[in-house]
Amino acid sequence: MPELPEVEITCRGIRPLVAGRTLTALEVRNPRLRQPVPADLAQTLVGERLQGVRRRAKYLLLDFPHGSVLVHLGMSGSLRVVSADEPAGVHDHVDLVFGAEALRLRDPRRFGLVLWHAGDGLSHPLLAALGREPLERGFTGAWLHEATRGVRLSIKQTLMDAHRVVGVGNIYASESLFRARIHPLAPAGAIGPQRLARLVASVRETLLAAIDAGGSTLRDFVGGDGRAGYFQQQYFVYGREGLACRVCATPVRRVVIGQRSTFFCPRCQRR
């Protein structure tokens, strides 16, 4: 699933290409995504100017004068700018057309979202209750220590709880915990403030490194310019079960936490 880095890369990639332009057409080839694409979306938006593109958690917000289109890439989606006359593939479900170019949603598993919200998109129910952005100033060790006080849930699950912290999905949670030398099964409330401060720094470091590398392309992800990411080549633990730890050569282990595969080094990340 595209996580925060992939969505941020998409946002940065498409923003300069479409922001400020007028929507000339909107084509929905298959409205059956996780929720149906609104049937009147074209009627609402064609002729309107796209004022800006921003990210909140794993959502993209396409801001128009009277509201926002919310886009979620689901498990396998990508959003990129193509020539408007480029033939659509079987998994290309939605085009927002700006003259000679189109912003095209490709979603093989159709688990993404394209929704309309009148007014500020941040007030949409899917976004209003989300937690802190890990790349913003409010995400600190002191805040995380307070937010996890008394929490018995594992630190891995806590990092992936979008009501606390957004965008740190399965891949980057495993990678961040390795960099911080924290065992993924450690109860969040039992981790001291110094180690949590180190974890906050590791989360930021991991996410920024992934953004610099164009994100992770394990299957379908490409950025707004159509390029694949290569951060997967830098993974310390994710997907490396049985392979030697890049730091100490101990075999990397896999454990299922909250129904998600989690990877760690038993030597570098002692309980």
Curated annotation (Swiss-Prot):
Zinc finger region(s), FPG-type: 236-270
InterPro entries membership: DNA_glyclase/AP_lyase_DNA-bd, DNA_glyclase_Znf_dom_DNA_BS, Formamido-pyr_DNA_Glyclase, FPG_cat, MutM-like_N-ter, Ribosomal_uS13-like_H2TH, Znf_DNA_glyclase/AP_lyase, Znf_FPG/IleRS
Subunit organization: Monomer.
SUPFAM superfamilies per UniProt: Glucocorticoid receptor-like (DNA-binding domain), N-terminal domain of MutM-like DNA repair proteins, S13-like H2TH domain
Catalytic activity: Hydrolysis of DNA containing ring-opened 7-methylguanine residues, releasing 2,6-diamino-4-hydroxy-5-(N-methyl)formamidopyrimidine; 2'-deoxyribonucleotide-(2'-deoxyribose 5'-phosphate)-2'-deoxyribonucleotide-DNA = a 3'-end 2'-deoxyribonucleotide-(2,3-dehydro-2,3-deoxyribose 5'-phosphate)-DNA + a 5'-end 5'-phospho-2'-deoxyribonucleoside-DNA + H(+)
HAMAP family: Fapy_DNA_glycosyl (MF_00103)
Record-given protein name: Formamidopyrimidine-DNA glycosylase
Name of one Pfam family that matches: zf-FPG_IleRS
Highest taxon listed in the record's lineage: Bacteria
